[in-house]
Amino acid sequence: MSRQERVQQVMNAFGKKVIQQSRSNLTKGKKNTSKTLYNSLGYNLDVAKTGNFSLSFEMEEYGNYQDLGVSGTKKKYDTPFKYTNKRPPASAFGNWVVRKGLKGTRDAKGRFTSRKGLQFAIANHIFEQGIKPTKFFSRPFGIEYNRLPLDIAKAFELTQIEFEKKIK
């Protein structure tokens, strides 16, 4: 097996581990209601004829907000994203409320609150409190990225051993 093939194998393993651990984190963190984000996670490894590698990861756009979080107007997180003056649309939580099985409750006066009222309350809460960072992708990427130089060095080491065996 050539050096390039070994490095390609290491890069493929890196991509698979990051995606597998990210999906696991989504499921464990109960952030996998619709499975859209889970199914959108993937990676592309491009190998040029010159031997250069390019590895890119893909996910739904809202995955960045789930991963890094969003600061609300009242609660701040260490994130580049924040709500300032525009609330998330209440209609965005319609299907989410149904999938989560949230039922309308009664208010202080005993009146039933509708699903639309519940959606508005959730949107308002997210606007004020933000979205807590889950690091479902960042954490596994960081861990595997720190291991990557060692794995690549091992791939080169194996080819060096094979080279030395051929010389003898």
Model feature map: region roles:
Residues 36-168:
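Charged, low-complexity interaction tracts
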